[in-house]
């Protein structure tokens, strides 16, 4: 697992209070990890802070799984 993937997983575990083994790249934040719309906004903000990147609203709407977040951040972080 890449450094970015590990950091994303850590943020998801901390923000959603889920078991680390439940967090896979295929995990959907809402359907699999029990997040609500506010949780997803907070996750996006946490990703922005952790990776020092801005995630535009249109991109944020496409980030629905852990893998989506990892792919976006691998492509757009410094």
UniProtKB/Swiss-Prot annotation:
Residues the record lists as O-(pantetheine 4'-phosphoryl)serine modifications: 37
Instruction: Name it.
Output: Acyl carrier protein
The answer to whether keyword Phosphoprotein applies is yes
Keyword Lipid metabolism listed: yes
Q: Where is the Carrier domain?
A: 2-77
What would be an example GO MF term here? acyl carrier activity
Q: Which UniProt keywords apply?
A: Cytoplasm, Fatty acid biosynthesis, Fatty acid metabolism, Lipid biosynthesis, Lipid metabolism, Phosphopantetheine, Phosphoprotein
Q: Which InterPro entries does the entry link to?
A: ACP (IPR003231), ACP-like_sf (IPR036736), PKS_PP-bd (IPR020806), PP-bd_ACP (IPR009081), Ppantetheine_attach_site (IPR006162)
Pathway(s) per entry: Lipid metabolism; fatty acid biosynthesis
SUPFAM superfamilies referenced in this protein's UniProt entry, alphabetically: ACP-like (SSF47336)
Which family is it part of?
Belongs to the acyl carrier protein (ACP) family.
Q: What cellular component GO annotations does this protein have?
A: cytosol; membrane
PTM description: 4'-phosphopantetheine is transferred from CoA to a specific serine of apo-ACP by AcpS. This modification is essential for activity because fatty acids are bound in thioester linkage to the sulfhydryl of the prosthetic group.
As for subcellular location, the record says: Cytoplasm
Q: Tell me which PANTHER family the record gives.
A: ACYL CARRIER PROTEIN (PTHR20863), CARRIER DOMAIN-CONTAINING PROTEIN (PTHR20863:SF76)
Organism name:
Methylorubrum extorquens (strain PA1) (Methylobacterium extorquens)
Q: Please give the function described in this protein's UniProt entry.
A: Carrier of the growing fatty acid chain in fatty acid biosynthesis.
Q: Which GO terms describe its biological process?
A: lipid A biosynthetic process
């Amino acid at each position: 697992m890449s450094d970015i993937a590990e950091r994303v997983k850590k943020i998801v575990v901390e923000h959603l209070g889920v078991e680390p083994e439940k967090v896979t790249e295929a995990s959907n934040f809402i359907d699999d990890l029990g997040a609500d719309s506010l949780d997803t906004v907070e996750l996006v903000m946490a990703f922005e802070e952790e990776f020092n990147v801005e995630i535009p609203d249109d991109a944020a709407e496409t980030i629905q799984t852990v893998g989506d977040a990892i792919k976006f951040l691998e492509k757009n972080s410094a």
